[in-house]
Structures are given as structure tokens and as C-alpha cells.
Regions:
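Structural signature of eukaryotic scaffold interfaces centered on beta-propeller domains
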Residues: 15-20, 67-77, 116-123, 172-181, ...
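Loop/turn-rich, solvent-exposed surfaces of beta-rich toroidal or solenoidal domains
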Residues: 272-353
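Short loop/turn segments immediately following beta-strands, especially the blade-tip
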Residues: 41-50, 92-101, 150-154, 201-210, ...
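Beta-propeller domains
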Residues: 169, 174-300
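Short, solvent-exposed loop/turn segments at conserved positions within beta-propeller repeat blades
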Residues: 32-35, 85-88, 136-142, 191-197, ...
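Asp-box/WD-like beta-propeller blade repeats and closely related beta-sheet repeat scaffolds
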Residues: 95-178, 189
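Blade-loop segments of beta-propeller domains
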Residues: 51-121
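Surface-exposed loop and turn segments in beta-propeller and other repeat-based domains
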Residues: 53-67, 105-112, 155-171, 209-225, ...
Length: 401
């Protein structure tokens, strides 16, 4: 599977502003699972003669991990956390010198928790992660939140299980609101064994689970299923949460004893329970929410200056087999890196947004020379680390400069 009045959002502390990013980092799996998964560094400088070329790679030293989520934006310390979901491992890449990337460390599960999914930085430099499962003998149950120090050592953890409310909760993604001492998490099961409508509210200071909200259906009747990505609005108090079934919900009241969630928007979903049909990892640029829509083979730009009344202001229609899934923005810029499924499985696209109007367009210059379709081609035979064949990118972020 798999985030606003000038409402610039993020998953935690404010993102930096900068001039154009020179690189994009993409976490990719070897397509035939015969060679190591790896992180690729791509030239993202539009002035460069090597624009869209792969300038370096660093193997993870592990095969078939299913590279999935990275952090949603490049952290200030230059160390990017990423998960190999099927292997239940975290990989930390040192990208302080982008043309010489290195694997800083890797580690497994902080038992009893397993299968890390999403990561968010905390003001103290630690990393808070969602873990889908708690291992219980020969089976698995609802996981929880785990806080790590910068070296990957577990500091504390908390269970997300609420069997009386929703036994299908599987901690998925998260948004941190330090000023309110709150964390908001979603609950989608990566294996689709359950279809949770839960959003959970936590106290950040001690990781106490305060509240589990079950989203109500929207106008279509099924928008509440599979809660996906929360993003914090610029007021630091309001959160928008999307669902894989293409609903959008507003969560507020986080500064009080009881938070509230309400449906505000729906986009098209074809009803198929598969990654290439879902609405997935969004990005927010200024007052615009950029939603990948697998069903519509498009990126959709919503003006959310009034979070109760999102309205479509831009749309980028891709190829008829392209299913965009992951969107990440350039810090302070107007570019978006996009990965996905279907026709995008072994490609990465660059889009641009007009920060004044929300209009979207494809950057066709960001294309591998000789490729038949726009984007960086990951279906190649040879990489800087060797002739390991095609790869499938998923998590992707821009460098901070």
C-alpha cells in the first residue's frame, strides 16, 4: 500500500525551506528478488546535464525485504530511515554526502513488536515508528508505537490494541503534534485481513493511548475503510486523514479532552481491494493537498484552505495503466516525486505544482534518455552497484539542498 489559509502540513516539525533540491532518494526492491534491495540517488538538478540519471546506489545487504516506506521528508541529520516490510527490518541510510551514500545501520524487531511501517521525527531527535503487529506465540495481534534513539535503540513502546472497539487495528502511519503533546495514528492492515476505520489519538509525552475514533462513512458509504495518512495543518491543531478508499476526514479538538473526526471529501474509488486502485500517500504544498488516485490514474490537487470544504483545483492525468501511490514534495519548492503501481511499478515521475493556483503538470525532462515513457526508468539491467536487473521503487524523498 501502502498527508492547510496557507496551511502547510507535515508529519511532524515544520519542513525546511530551500532552493531547488539537487537529488532524489528512492528506496527500491530488486524485482525478481535475486539481488539485494537498494537505495538509489537520482540527479534532480534541472540545470544538470545528468538530470534524471542515477548517480549512485547503495545495496541494503538484504534480498526480498519488500522496500516500502521511508520517512516522508529528508531529515535534518541526513540519516534516512526506511523499512523492509516483509523482512520486518529497518534500514538507516547515511545521505549526508548524496553522491557517496552508505548504509549506516540496520536492525530487526524490538520484540514483541514486529513489521515497522512509518517513521516520524520527534523534537528530541528520536524517531517514533508504527509497528503493525505484536508477536504472540505463533500468531500476531495489534501492534503499537515504538520510540527509538538515533542509534536505533528502543526507548519506550505502547500497545495500540483496543479489542472491544476494533480488533483489526494495525498501526499504519502517524502525525506528531509536539505543541499539543499529541500523536495521531491510522490503522490499515498491510495484508488486508481487516479494513479498519480507526484513527487513534495518543499523548506524546508518555505514549498513552487516549482515544480510538471510528470514522463514519461519507456520502458514498464506504470512505471510512482503511485509514491511511494523517497530516498536520499549519495551525498545529488540525489534522486531515485520508483513507485508501478515497475519503478525506478532518480531525480537530486535539488540544482538548476529546478529539472529533468528520468526513469532508471523497474522490473516486473503483471498489477494488488492491494497491493500484487506492488513494494513498499524499503531499501538502501550501494550501493544496496533492492526492494520488490509483483508480483515476491521476494526481488530484485540492484547495484545503477551508479544511471543511476541499475543492479540486488541479489534475494531472497519467497513463491509463499508471497507478500513482506515493507523492513527496520538494522542500520549499514546486516539485513532486511520484512512485506507484501498474505502469508506474518500475518508474518514478516528476510533477510540478503552481503554488499560486494548485495546477499540476508533468516534468517530461525528468526522463531516462531513450525511455519510451516519462520518468526515471527502474526497469534497467545495470546499476552503479552491478548488473542486478529491474527494480521497484516505493518510498522517495528530495534532498534538503
Amino acid at each position: 500500500m501502502a498527508a492547510l489559509a496557507a496551511c502547510h502540513a507535515g508529519t511532524g516539525p515544520a519542513r525546511p525551506t530551500s532552493s531547488a533540491s539537487r537529488f532524489v532518494f528512492l528506496w527500491a526492491g530488486d524485482a525478481d528478488k535475486a539481488a539485494s534491495d537498494f537505495l538509489a540517488v537520482v540527479d534532480a538538478d534541472p540545470r544538470s546535464a545528468g538530470y534524471a540519471s542515477v548517480v549512485a546506489t547503495v545495496p541494503a545487504g538484504a534480498i526480498g525485504t519488500r522496500p516500502h516506506h521511508t520517512e516522508y521528508a529528508m531529515p535534518a541529520d541526513g540519516l534516512l530511515w526506511a523499512n523492509g516490510f516483509d523482512a520486518s527490518r529497518t534500514f538507516v541510510f547515511d545521505l549526508r554526502h548524496p553522491e557517496r551514500p552508505a548504509l549506516a545501520r540496520t536492525f530487526g524487531d524490538p520484540l514483541p513488536y514486529g513489521h515497522p511501517h512509518s517513521y516520524a521525527r520527534l523534537p528530541n531527535g528520536h524517531v517514533l515508528a508504527t509497528f503493525q503487529w505484536e508477536m504472540a506465540g505463533g500468531h500476531h495481534e495489534t501492534g503499537g508505537l515504538v520510540e527509538f534513539d538515533p542509534d536505533g535503540r528502543m526507548v519506550r513502546a505502547a500497545r495500540a490494541a483496543v479489542p472491544a472497539i476494533d480488533p483489526g487495528v494495525r498501526p499504519y502511519s502517524l502525525a506528531v503534534l509536539p505543541a499539543l503533546d499529541r500523536v495521531v495514528t491510522t490503522a490499515s492492515d498491510m495484508h488486508l485481513e481487516s479494513r479498519s476505520a480507526a484513527v487513534q489519538i495518543w499523548r506524546l509525552s508518555d505514549l498513552t493511548l487516549l482515544q480510538t475514533i471510528l470514522l463514519a462513512p461519507g456520502r458514498r458509504g464506504d470512505e471510512q475503510q482503511l485509514t491511511a495518512e494523517p497530516r498536520v495543518l499549519a495551525d498545529g491543531r488540525t489534522v486531515l486523514v485520508n483513507t485508501f478508499t478515497c475519503g478525506l476526514y478532518r480531525v480537530d479538538g486535539l488540544d482538548g479532552p476529546t478529539a472529533r473526526a468528520r468526513w469532508v471529501y471523497s474522490s473516486t474509488w473503483n471498489g477494488r481491494w488492491e494497491g493500484k486502485s487506492f488513494c494513498a500517500v499524499p503531499e501538502v504544498v501550501g494550501r493544496f493537498w496533492i492526492q494520488p488516485s490509483g483508480t483515476e490514474h491521476a494526481l488530484v490537487s485540492l484547495d484545503v484552505s477551508d479544511p471543511d470544504q476541499p475543492r479540486e483545483v488541479g489534475r494531472l492525468v497519467l497513463g491509463d495503466t499508471d497507478a500513482p501511490h506515493w507523492v513527496a514534495g520538494e522542500p520549499g519548492g514546486d516539485r513532486l516525486i511520484v512512485t506507484g503501481y501498474g505502469g508506474l511499478e518500475s518508474r518514478a515521475l516528476m510533477a510540478r505544482i503552481d503554488r499560486a493556483t494548485g495546477a499540476l503538470r508533468l516534468d517530461e525532462a525528468f526522463t531516462t534518455p531513450g525511455a519510451a515513457r516519462p520518468g526515471v526508468d527502474f526497469g534497467r539491467d545495470t546499476w552503479p552497484h552491478g548488473a542486478t536487473g529491474p527494480a521497484i521503487p516505493h518510498g522517495a524523498v528530495f534532498s534538503r539542498r
